[in-house]
């Protein structure tokens, strides 16, 4: 997420960021502003529908529009399904899938107005099940199906949908 923020900033974008850790967000916001980048940070738990709505509302309030939404919040897991507590899968779906659904639901009308882009960061695990990643793979398959369906539903409206599936990366997903 942080790397994406800096890449968009480097290209002149105004940045709205949402995450649970407000202190980290504010550090990034301060750094961006010191570089002349207009930035907004909003504490957001993507498992909470109202947090996602608030993030979108504050973004539109501040910038007047949304050109790109990057759904990047995610958590992972490692355990064989037979050893797994079902709450782990529920939590994975809440963050990885429902977080994408909630943020997209509230941002989509604004993205359609700008004929902008809707992005979902999934994983190679969203194409091929990985051992010990049952819940994680399921959540990423769900995001891929959701976004691909939105692409088809909005073909004639100018919506660009990108589903990015990187391999293993250096990130905070396990933290």
Cite the ranges covered by each PLM segment.
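SDR active-site lid
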Residues: 156-175
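The beta1-alpha1 cofactor-binding region of Rossmann-like NAD(H)/NADP(H)-dependent oxidoreductases
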Residues: 22, 44-54, 86
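Active-site helix of classical SDR
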Residues: 104, 139
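Canonical Rossmann dinucleotide-binding motif of NAD(H)/NADP(H)-dependent dehydrogenases/reductases
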Residues: 1-14
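Residue(s) in the substrate-gating loop at a strand-loop-helix junction
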Residues: 123
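Substrate-binding pocket helix/loop in short-chain dehydrogenase/reductase
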Residues: 80-81, 85-91
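Conserved glycine-rich Rossmann-like NAD(P)H-binding loop of the short-chain dehydrogenase/reductase
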Residues: 11-27
